[in-house]
Amino acid sequence: MAYLKIVLVALMLVLAVSAMRRPDQQDQDISVAKRVACKCDDDGPDVRSATFTGTVDLGSCNSGWEKCASYYTVIADCCRKPRG
């Protein structure tokens, strides 16, 4: 019976600690930008040796960025900041 009490207390402590998150930690989790690299048309023909200079943006490119891939997808575009 003592073993069961120890296990229950330990589980309650784990639950309490995991439930106590500071509000600023929750905000940081949401605002983290997740970027994925993509290959622009002028990066080269071979995917293995090309440097990926583009960034995948969901929907369409952000303001001030240009679409750098000729292929079309409904969900995302391959974009980068204009050169020059």
From Swiss-Prot:
SUPFAM superfamilies cross-referenced by the UniProt entry: Defensin-like
InterPro entries, A to Z: Myo_ane_neurotoxin_sf (IPR023355)
Main location: secreted
Keyword presence, Plastid: no
Subcellular compartments: Secreted; Nematocyst
A molecular function GO annotation: sodium channel regulator activity
Propeptide: 20-33
Record-linked Gene3D superfamilies: Anthopleurin-A
Superkingdom to which the source organism belongs: Eukaryota
Keywords: Cleavage on pair of basic residues, Disulfide bond, Ion channel impairing toxin, Nematocyst, Neurotoxin, Secreted, Signal, Toxin, Voltage-gated sodium channel impairing toxin
Disulfide-linked positions: C38-C78, C40-C68, C61-C79
Pfam family, any one: Toxin_4
Leader sequence residues: 1-19
Function summary: Binds specifically to the voltage-gated sodium channel (Nav) and delays its inactivation.
Protein family per UniProt: Belongs to the sea anemone sodium channel inhibitory toxin family. Type II subfamily.
Protein's recorded name: Delta-thalatoxin-Cad1a
Protein source organism: Cryptodendrum adhaesivum (Adhesive sea anemone)
